[in-house]
Amino acid sequence: MWGFWLLLFWGFSGTHRWGMTTLAILGQRLNGVNECQDTTTCPAYATCTDTTESYYCTCKQGFLPSNGQTNFQGPGVECQDVNECLRSDSPCGSNSVCTNIPGRARCSCLSGFSSSAGGSWILGSPGHFLCTDVDECLTIGICPKNSNCSNSVGSYSCTCQSGFVSNGSTCEDEDECVTRNACPEHATCHNTLGSYYCTCNEGLEFSGGGPMFQGLEESCEDVDECSRNSTLCGPSFICINTLGSYSCSCPAGFSLSTFQIPGHPADGNCTDIDECDDICPSNSSCTNTLGSYFCTCHPGFASSNGQLNFTDQEVTCEDIDECTQDPFRCGRNSSCTNVPGSYNCSCLPDFRMDPGGSQAHGNFTCKRIPFKCKEDLIPKSEQIEQCQAGQGRNLDYTSFCTFVNATFTILDNTCENKSAPVSLQSAATSVSLMLEQASTWFEFSREETSTLGTILLETVESTMLAALLTPSGNASQTIRTEYLEIESKVINEECNEENVSINLKARGDKMDVGCFIIKESESTGTPGVAFVSFAHMDSVLDERFFEDGQASWKLRMNSHVVGGTVTGERKEDFSKPIVYTLQHIQPKQKSERSICVSWNTDVEDGRWTPSGCETVEASETHTVCSCNRMTNLAIIMASGELTMEFSLYIISYVGTVISLVCLALAIATFLLFRAVQNHNTYLHLHLCVCLFLAKILFLTGIDKTDNQTACAIIAGFLHYLFLACFFWMLVEAVMLFLMVRNLKVVNYFSSRNIKMLHLCAFGYGLPVVVVIISATVHPWGYGMHNRCWLNTETGFIWSFLGPVCMIITINSALLAWTLWVLRQKLCSVNSEVSKLKDTRLLTFKAIAQIFILGCSWVLGIFQIGPLASIMAYLFTTINSLQGAFIFLIHCLLNRQVRDEYRKLLTRKTDLSSHSQTSGILLSSMPSTSKTG
């Protein structure tokens, strides 16, 4: 049956040829033929098995039939080789190579492996195939010399030993000292076969000990040869350790005599260096010492570091100001002048050095000279020095120097023969001859005239003193010449009694000297006094030389020039005054004021000055002067008759009188009319009282200069009263501003809540503070020779102008702000109200506040340039009428006050007719009063 189905299969799928073949075979089988005898019955790689009925083919081991049947027949089926190497279980094992061959596989080991079964083993052969690693390193010579063999699975590797590098197939020695940084700093590298070693350089040692080492992590440390061997350089040298070596040097201040090789012991000697060639600063001396030096500042200098001896070259020697260290170094009546490295002592004017003392010995003393000589006058005047230098030959100086030399001749006769009697008569005659030629002096310049006048006055004074001091001159004398009259008196027993005065007269002039002045003058020996009166001297040393030449005064000399002197060292600052009574050359006019002036040689070359003397009394024929020193004196008449100033005086006088009347009426109004009394009228009252007192004192006391003490007191009160006026003006301005500002909120003056006591403390207290401070700082600032006011020649006037300028600025700002707020308020009210006739009145009141609050004082600042005259008239007119403005605004233009005036005049008392206050604001009354 099997054959039939096979035949059937092939019949359907094969070709006709194969069908015919199958039929033939089948026929043979049916005939009992052994098909296996035919070698072509089965395909290649198959075995044929004959059966009773047929046969079958079976593929050999390692092959598989193409039809997938284990037993098959007939051609068409092929036995295909099985690739055993593709099996997942790796038939040959690890580390092997499987090679497929027909019907089987051949196993061989990979390179580097071997098997006990041989190099090639057929799969299926007897035994077991296993590849194991071959250790190539066991083979001698497999790696080159100086290398190491490293076996690995299936292979090996050769690496050069440490210290060797590969060069192709050989290992050569590596020079580590060349190829890499093998040793640390300060070490030397030494190459060896296959290695290296390091050694520290000379003078250094390995930190780990030992002579040799390897590795950069090690270090070479310096060997301190100096500490290991203290005698290395010798006893007189200093051993200095260096890196890897040492050196020998001399101590500071010494030098080596020979060159020293570093790292070798010292050879030679150390010799001292003289550093003092140019090492100390200027103004110092250098002192060389063994191995060193030090600097010392010269006497009169001190080192900047405070040390007496120093070596620091940054230190300097600075001059010592001995005069500052000890202000009394030169003693009394002397001046100390610092000079580099020292100081100079000199005596004050009118003093001379005591010959028994010296600056060098520290006992420099000055004694008042009894009288001045030529050397005391020359240093004070440049003109005199020119004459002494021979420039008098110049035509411009000939006449002047002739007078100077003639005066010095008189002085030389007095000074050069101090022990010989002095002829006062002869000196007076010579001076008279010079005064006789006084008309020639008008050819001299102002400086030359004052210089010549000074030396002539000093010469006469010295001559009078010399006559009193010389033994033969101890007798009272009266010398009369045409141009000079002298009376001298020696005091014997006249001063034995207390309160006695010595009276001296000359040409109608008189000097009264109290005996207490004789005692205070510290006279030695028999004391004496002298008095002189010069004729014609007043014509040359006239009012042109007045120190305070005010443009507002006409000045004229109206007395002879007189002078007084007293023996003794002290001639000024006496406890009680010396009284001079000088006769007028012309009668004194009522409009004139007498000024006692003394000749001051410290101002330029000489000037008349009122300081030191006071006018005690002035009549038509005489003026009495009180001076605190012996001086040269004269009387200058001052009068204010210039047109412009006189007209301003009249305006000021009339305006002040009008203001006083108005202020008196305003004060009476605020005090007597109870209906108008309120917080505002109290403020007006205080301002009116201060202005009234200030103006009446100004009117009656500004020119009371006869008594300087009383004049200073008047000036102090004026200072206080005018300051109080301005402080109350400030209070008025602030209160007015607060009232207007509060109109925006409610028609009520909330500033009423400010207590009047506080306002009084401000208005009266602050001026007191200013005056006290001013008087303490500058007590001589009150009172001048021509008016009882603050001294305008110094900055003392700013004790008044400073506060005034500040208050004017504040008041002006507050008033501007007030007017701006008021304008807004008026614009916001009913238009009918704004058209009332009161608008013009309110505008007038607003403008008037400028004058009431003192803002017009700013006009005084603009009294300069071409507008000075206009500003002066405006300033004088407006400010003199300040009281009138106050009365006009606060009284006459106030309806309530006018009603009170009307009641007073008509004696009607209608208490029900009270109206509200006038002038919305600027009358300084409550807010909504009416005006009419």
Curated annotation (Swiss-Prot):
Alphabetical list of InterPro entries matching this protein: EGF-like_Ca-bd_dom, EGF-like_dom, EGF-type_Asp/Asn_hydroxyl_site, EGF_Ca-bd_CS, GAIN_B, GAIN_dom_N, GAIN_dom_sf, GPCR_2-like_7TM
Domain GAIN-B, chain residue ranges per copy: 482-643
Transmembrane domains' residue ranges: 653-673, 682-702, 720-740, 757-777, 796-816, 850-870, 873-893
Residues in the Cytoplasmic compartment per record: 674-681, 741-756, 817-849, 894-932
Subcellular location: Cell membrane
Described purpose of this protein according to its UniProt entry: Orphan receptor involved in cell adhesion and probably in cell-cell interactions involved specifically cells of the immune system. May play a role in regulatory T-cells (Treg) development.
Family recorded in the similarity comment: Belongs to the G-protein coupled receptor 2 family. Adhesion G-protein coupled receptor (ADGR) subfamily.
Name of the protein this chain belongs to: Adhesion G protein-coupled receptor E2
Species, as recorded: Rattus norvegicus
Taxonomy of the source species: Eukaryota, Metazoa, Chordata, Craniata, Vertebrata
Protein encoded by which gene: Adgre1
